[in-house]
Amino acid sequence: VRPIDARLTAFAPGRTQRGFSKITLRRLLCACVAVLWCVAFAVGQTAPAPGSPAADARFTEVPGTVIDHSPAASGVYIGSPALAVLPNGEYIASHDFFGPGSEKNRTDLFSSQDKGRTWRRIATVIGQWWSSLFFHRNALYLMGTSRENGFAVIRKSTDGGRTWTEPKDETSGLLFGDGRYHCAPVPVVLHRGRLWRAMEDAMGPDGWGRHFNSFMMSADENADLLRAANWRSSNRLAGNPNWLDGGFGGWLEGNAVVAPDGTVVNMLRVDTPSCPEKVAMVRTSRDGREAGFDPATGFIDFPGGAKKFTIRFDPESRQYWCVASIVAEPYKSKGKPAGIRNTLALTCSPDLQRWVVRRVLLEHPDTLKHGFQYVDWIFDGRDIIAVCRTAYDDGLGGAHNYHDANFLTFHRFEDFR
């Protein structure tokens, strides 16, 4: 599979000017150009704006199509990519912002009407973070938290992501307002008349990783998804630091997946000090009320298991597929698996137990300031389409590090089967 070439689209116009009586003619002309590009953006044009980051020739080496860019110097980094396809064929992508310069409560949304070749920003949502995008019953939904470790919330859009409902109370999208919650853009799965989505709270002891308690949420497919009473939750499971011979550092960012036996399982990222990477398979009862984990059998070797991943089942190949940030052999001595994100690979399994790497999709030899991570993806016929939190060179000093990404990129991986 070859990464597609970057095609860059601008979103932001230039800044307004002050002190017009003192500015030079050149500055006045630049200001006029900026206003014209404001108008172009307002009417939905996608041509690159002069001087905008997306129009910068220095981005042509970035793999894929650049959707958004935030320079490291801003202290605002790009996180939580999510992707959905509307019935009319329009692609919708989203991401949030983290880092010392961010409020850790904002999600931006983008639209592509040409199969991912060009993108434009269509909305900014304040009070939404770590969110999945999914389309259900003629509406688009954002489901995640209100901010970093905030309340669990869901929003609805009936105009393709341009405007969104506000989760003000338990009837309008506030699902849990009683504590600290955590998740990522993970799959929302329809199975046996219910929608399923994994979640964690962050209310356990001992800090990051070990404070996550995993659980499964589900709702009737015909229910009003904005009403908290329509969502059912399993019991919440805490991890145990003694698991994996004392190497268990926590579980998080679980995927709801329909197992071969027809039950829904929660496949969770596991923080470990060394390879092989692992996932934890938590079993869920058919009614979604009970979750259970057996540490003797529930840990599975899984390439990329120490970072966020997305698993989806393909009926045509009868395989489970995953796009994950694996630790390739040359990099296994570079540090903890969670800190190695320079290789993106396609993996698959017939049964959720035996996973193999099918091909490397993206790779860079540097592990310190380059990363391909947190990929959300969808089957698109013979291809996989994906959005990626990408740390890469930008001509401005590059990413702060492999983790603190400066790009959101779109990719099409052809003929994945």
What are the language-model segments listed below?
Residues 311:
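Catalytic cores of secreted/periplasmic lytic hydrolases that degrade extracellular macromolecules
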Residues 1-26:
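N-terminal secretory signal peptides that target proteins for export/translocation
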Residues 307-308:
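Alpha-helical scaffolding within the catalytic cores
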Residues 45-80, 84-130, 134-184, 188-249, ...:
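Beta-rich carbohydrate-recognition and catalytic domains
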Residues 372-375:
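Short glycine-rich, acidic/polar surface loops and turns
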Residues 29-40:
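Bacterial N-terminal signal peptides
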Residues 378:
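Short alpha-helix at the nucleotide-sugar/activated-sugar donor binding site of glycosyltransferases
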